From Swiss-Prot:
EC code(s) of this entry: 3.1.2.2
Pfam families: 4HBT
Binding residue positions for substrate: 172, 193-194
InterPro entries noted in UniProt: HotDog_dom_sf, THEM4/THEM5_acyl-CoA_thioest, Thioestr_dom
Family from the record: Belongs to the THEM4/THEM5 thioesterase family.
Name of the protein in question: Acyl-coenzyme A thioesterase THEM4
Length: 222
């Protein structure tokens, strides 16, 4: 092989060079464009796929928001964590992982409420059929995603921008698809740039503990 290459070089024939510019390589997918003149959709409000249990919990926390105890957090498909005063991104081809489906009810159906006094972020979560892991149950990775999203939102609302440094999940009881669970997270302590949080996932009626977790976040600004 080496002798053959040497002969080609000796005769002035150049071997083809592999293109190293990654930007010139064709993509394996095409991202559709979602340009719209309409106001961005808030996914954190009820739609027709929400079950009675999810609606009941939503209404319960909305009642708490009237007294100022809880505050509903808007949810958009192009913003990781909504911050008041910062308009949601529009005309963006990328989508937030938990809001990347066009059909309601088949993936991540959830809404979040924040309690500033208790440093708690609660997420009401109804997993759809596209999140299946073991037959009939929610994939563990999807559960971890929602824990990361909920604890991260709580850290952001208390401390500003953060990044996940560590996530430890203890799965205790599987979560059936279509059921409603409460993801209850709390910022436990802050040490310098480190934000320590805890989290539990319980059934809608608090009768079963599905998951426990801890997460460590690092504040982006000192």
């Amino acid at each position: 092989m080496l002798r053959s290459c040497a002969r080609l070089i000796y005769k002035g024939i150049t071997l083809p060079r592999q293109q190293q510019n990654l930007h010139s390589l064709p993509c394996s997918y095409t991202a559709p464009k979602f340009y719209s003149q309409e106001a961005p959709r808030d996914y954190g409000v009820p739609n027709t796929t929400w079950s009675k249990n999810l609606l009941d919990l939503y209404n319960k926390y909305m009642e708490g928001s009237k007294s100022g105890t809880w505050k509903r957090i808007p949810s958009y498909n192009a913003t990781v964590h909504y911050i008041k005063g910062v308009p949601p991104v529009r005309n963006r081809e990328k989508r937030l992982f938990t809001r990347n489906l066009d059909q309601d009810g088949v993936g991540f159906e959830y809404c979040m409420f924040y309690n500033k006094a208790e440093r708690r972020m609660v997420c009401l979560f109804q997993p759809g059929p596209y999140l299946e892991g073991p037959p009939g149950f929610t994939h563990g990775g999807c559960i971890a995603t929602m824990i990361d999203s909920t604890t991260g939102a709580g850290a952001v609302y208390l401390c500003g921008g953060v990044m996940t440094a560590n996530l430890t999940v203890d799965y205790k009881n599987p979560i059936p698809l279509g059921c409603v669970v409460i993801i209850d997270s709390k910022v436990e302590k802050i040490e310098g740039r480190k934000v320590f949080t805890s989290c539990q996932i319980r059934s809608h009626d608090d009768s079963m503990l599905h998951t426990e977790a801890t997460a460590l976040f690092i504040k982006l600004c000192p």
